């Protein structure tokens, strides 16, 4: 089996697709455990704490004898993906992707990846993954909702507009303040999950993709509202987040069922009740 010849399994699929992979993973890992080879399984998904889910699913499918040896030969590690990818739809085989920052992974015990470009080991991976929602996804959502308000179709257009940029920058500043305040992380750690200060070559990215599902993205614990709440509680400047949230409630896309549901609620009961509900 070809997969069993590799020391590192780097898996980049959606969480819901792992169920189709477990039989292959178990077969390959069984071969490697029997042969005494150590394996690092890197779970490249933005779902929080998903490596433990993958590990438990692998263990539940292993023979009892191999289960006892699992921890001696297999490590399943959490990662953070920091990239932007765009396609016309979810079945299109042509896509554009851009690495915004190095991907991050928990320190490995079984294999050396120090010479692999584009990935680095770091501690606090679960905290950083949670914070990425605020430091990266927050400004991105702010750019999308302000860009929609200004009549743009792509993030690229919004990035050239000072109105959109000012809101996204303010959201980014508050996110960094929240990261320092709530988790006491040093600036170099926060920079690993923040937009780079140097300009990178952009890819075409649609506002409809980034703005999709405003119900989730305007949730109380999500990318825009939670930092704003922390800002209110700690006398921080949350005005950029307030603007982004307000513009999010204006987002109206007929092709987005979540947007349609939110707009229907606003029309029926008014914005104040809609804000409380969503």
Task: Label the model's feature ranges.
Residues 1, 5-14, 19-278:
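Substrate/ligand-engaging "lid" and interaction regions
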């Amino acid at each position: 089996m070809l997969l069993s010849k590799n020391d590192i399994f780097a898996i980049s699929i959606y969480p819901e697709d792992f169920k189709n992979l477990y039989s292959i993973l178990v077969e390959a890992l069984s071969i490697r455990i029997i042969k005494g080879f150590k394996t690092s399984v890197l779970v490249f998904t933005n779902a929080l704490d998903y490596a433990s889910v993958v590990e438990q699913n692998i263990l539940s499918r292993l023979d009892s004898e191999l289960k006892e040896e699992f921890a001696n030969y297999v490590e399943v590690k959490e990662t953070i993906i920091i990239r932007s990818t765009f396609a016309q739809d979810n079945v299109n085989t042509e896509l554009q992707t851009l690495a915004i920052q190095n991907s991050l992974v928990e320190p490995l015990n079984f294999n050396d990846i120090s010479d692999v470009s584009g990935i680095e080991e770091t501690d606090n991976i679960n905290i950083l993954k949670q914070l990425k929602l605020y430091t990266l996804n927050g400004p991105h959502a702010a750019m999308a909702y302000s860009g929609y308000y200004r009549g743009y179709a792509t993030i690229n257009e919004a990035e050239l507009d000072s109105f959109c940029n000012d809101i996204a920058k303010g959201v980014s500043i508050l996110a960094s303040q929240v990261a320092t305040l709530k988790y006491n992380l040093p600036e170099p750690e926060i920079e690993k999950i923040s937009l780079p200060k140097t300009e990178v070559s952009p890819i075409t990215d649609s506002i409809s993709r980034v703005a999709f599902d405003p119900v989730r993205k305007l949730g109380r614990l999500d990318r825009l509202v939670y930092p704003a709440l922390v800002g209110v509680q700690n006398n921080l400047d949350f005005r950029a987040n307030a603007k982004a949230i307000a513009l999010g409630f204006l987002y109206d896309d007929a092709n987005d069922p979540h947007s349609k549901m939110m707009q229907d609620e606003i029309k029926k009961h008014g914005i104040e009740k809609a804000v409380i509900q969503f």
